[in-house]
Amino acid sequence: DALLGVGVLEHVAKLELSETEKVEAYRNFFGRCHKWLKPGGWMSLQTGVYGNMLREDFSQFIATDVFPESDYPNLVDLAKASERLFEIVAIRNDRKDYELTCKAWLSKLKANRTAAVNLVGSEVVARYEKYLNFCIIGFHIGTINLVRITMRRIDKPRS
C-alpha cells in the first residue's frame, strides 16, 4: 500500500494562517493519510517548500493571482506535523530540476503563445509567463525548493 501526492501540500494551508494553524492543518492531512494506509504503508510527496525566504517575502502576485488560498510549507512544519505518524525516510531537493522544468514550460508557452491567447486570453497567458519567470528565479537562487519526501507509516504511533 502506498500514497503518492504531487503538489498537494501547497494547498493544505492558507498564507494567512499562523504557523501553529498551518502545522495543525498539515497534522490533519498526515492523520488522514495515516488512516488510509495499511500497516507498513509508504507515502511519497512532492511539494514546493520555502527555501531561503521568509513567508513575509512570498510574492503577493503568486499568492493572489496564481494560487489564491495556497502556501508553501516549511520542511520543519512538515516534520513536526508528521511526528509519530510517519517516519521520514528520505528527503531530496530537486530545485534545479524544477528550474529546468519551468524553463521548458515557459519556452513551450512562448512557442504556442498565439494558440494559448486564443484559448484563455492574453491576460491569463501574461500572468503565467510572469509566474513561470518568478519560479525560474526562485528555484535558481533557492528561495523556493522542490522536495520529494519518502515516508513510512508508523503502525503504532505513541500519543
Q: Residue spans of the language-model regions?
A:
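Outer-membrane beta-barrel domain signature
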Residues: 19-20, 138
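A short hydrophobic/small-residue beta-strand
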Residues: 43-44
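Substrate-binding/catalytic lobe of Class I Rossmann-like enzymes that use SAM or dcSAM, i.e.
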Residues: 48-159
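Conserved SAM-binding strand-loop segment of SAM-dependent methyltransferases
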Residues: 1
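A conserved beta-strand element that flanks and buttresses the S-adenosyl-L-methionine
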Residues: 4-9
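A short glycine-rich, Lys/Arg-flanked "PGG" loop and its adjoining helix->strand segment in the class I
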Residues: 20-40
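A short His-aromatic
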Residues: 11-16
